[in-house]
């Protein structure tokens, strides 16, 4: 009897040891699996990141390169969007806290003869049915160069892709009721060509312009009250619209302005009226 009890106890101890060993082995396998899964996820992320196209970097230009850009090149055709005159000199934007449509027309942009950073601008704005003339200036204060592989061998006439930042002040006539001043920052992304010309760079969708090429971002300040309202306008309004108003554009192939924003002045976006002329006429 005593011998039987000893054998039973020995069997129970052996079973317990086996269970503990199996549990330890199971825990070890689970831990190893967690590590393996973690490494797999990390490896997948690394491979995913490696497969992404290289980021476009903005590099500060040398003082000499900055001087060359300002002195040798005239950026006024970019402000005027001269490649697609005349209607393209009109820029669309958002004004006020409700982001109602506003249009800005640049009638003339001239580079100052003595100060290569200074550009003089005249034009008109249209907000709802109010058309107001303005004049002012843009001052270019920084220039940067893109380090990018977007320049193909077919674009041998491109010297480089650049971005300039500056400030603007556009003053409405003080004698007019409800007049004020537009002021803020301006960003332009463009290419410098070997023939000393410039053109917009259409391949970029990073930084402030978001592919809009030319962006004025600031506020309008009332002369009378000193109160301000936000304003932003751009060459390619579709590029920034969705960051201002939710679902501003709809459609994949045939992109259009969302009808729900027609009440904010976007119902006649495609109408060809030369509102900036003293004697408006339909455009052909």
PLM features: what roles do these ranges have?
Residues 129-133:
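Short coil-to-beta-strand transition motifs
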Residues 16-18:
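Bacterial signal peptide processing site
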Residues 2-9:
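Sec-dependent N-terminal signal peptides
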Residues 42-107, 117, 121-125, 157-178, ...:
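Tryptophan-anchored aromatic micro-motifs
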Residues 71-72, 98-106, 137-155, 177-205:
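Charged, amphipathic alpha-helical segments
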Residues 20-46:
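Low-complexity, Pro/Thr/Ser/Glu-rich flexible segments characteristic
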Residues 11-14:
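C-terminal motif of bacterial Sec signal peptides marking the signal peptidase cleavage site
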